Design a protein with these regions (language model features):
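Exposed loop/turn and edge beta-strand positions of beta-sandwich/beta-sheet ligand-binding modules
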Residues: 8, 34, 95
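Unchanged
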Residues: 38-61, 71-123, 135
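Conserved S-adenosyl-L-methionine
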Residues: 63-67
Length: 135
């Protein structure tokens, strides 16, 4: 039997002290929370912190593990966290055309991909952590 090959990703819903959420505008998916692939030899929370820094310029602290989204057909497992900013300044990259903090209500209007919007809602629903969503 061949070894399974899964892509492991990590994303973070970063909330500032005004309860605004950090979003970036991806050229592929539009507005979303920061995240991406965990590198070989990297801890999953460390990957979430690194991806947030790379995509937004913001340094974060992980507050809580929220849950898992598994895309079965594409073999992608995305771990989701809640985080808070601890430093840094907004920067953009090839992965992020724009970066900013937005009210939860505004963010949910801005995020157009249903799956990405659901991830935010699941992360904010702390009573139901941890969650696992397969699709």
């Amino acid at each position: 039997m061949p070894y399974p090959k899964h892509i492991v990703c990590a994303s973070t819903a970063v909330l500032n002290d005004k309860n605004e959420i950090l979003l970036l505008k991806s050229p592929k998916r539009g507005w979303e929370i920061p995240g991406g692939q965990v590198e070989e030899g990297e801890a999953i929370p460390t990957g979430a912190i690194r991806e947030t820094k790379e995509e937004t310029g913001i340094d974060i602290e992980i507050i809580k593990y929220c849950g898992l989204y598994q895309n079965v057909s594409r073999c992608i497992c995305t771990h989701l966290f809640l985080g808070k900013p601890v430093g840094g300044q907004f920067t953009t990259s090839i992965e992020s055309l724009e970066v900013g903090y937005f009210s939860i209500e505004e963010a949910l209007r801005m995020v157009t991909w249903k799956n990405l919007k659901e991830r935010i809602l699941h992360c904010l629903d702390e009573e139901n952590h941890p969650f696992m969503v397969t699709f």
